[in-house]
Amino acid sequence: DCESGPCCRDCKFLKEGTVCRIARGDNKHDYCNGKTCDCPSNPHKGKHH
């Protein structure tokens, strides 16, 4: 399925919900989506309520 990337292991996509980037500060963790080898950005990053 994939060659390399934070959401790829042994040529397979990691399952949806696997943490691929640990949160820093007020940011939230980023998670694999099960469809890409890249680590998609969390849409809620850096937004304060």
From Swiss-Prot:
Where the record places motif Cell attachment site is 24-26
Q: What does the entry list under GO cellular component?
A: extracellular region
GO MF: toxin activity
**Domain of life of the source:** Eukaryota
The residues forming the signal peptide are none
Q: Where in the cell is it found?
A: Secreted
Q: Which cysteines are joined by disulfide bonds?
A: 2-11, 7-32, 8-37, 20-39
Free-text tissue specificity from the UniProt record: Expressed by the venom gland.
Domain Disintegrin per the UniProt entry, residue ranges: 1-47
Q: Report the principal subcellular site.
A: secreted
Assigned keywords, A-Z: Cell adhesion impairing toxin, Disulfide bond, Hemostasis impairing toxin, Platelet aggregation inhibiting toxin, Secreted, Toxin
Q: Does the keyword GTP-binding apply?
A: no
The record makes one more remark, namely: The disintegrin belongs to the short disintegrin subfamily.
**The protein's role, per its UniProt record:** Inhibits ADP-induced human platelet aggregation.
Q: What family is this protein classified in?
A: Belongs to the venom metalloproteinase (M12B) family. P-II subfamily. P-IIa sub-subfamily.
Under the subunit heading, UniProt states:
Monomer (disintegrin).
**Record-given protein name:** Disintegrin leucogastin-B
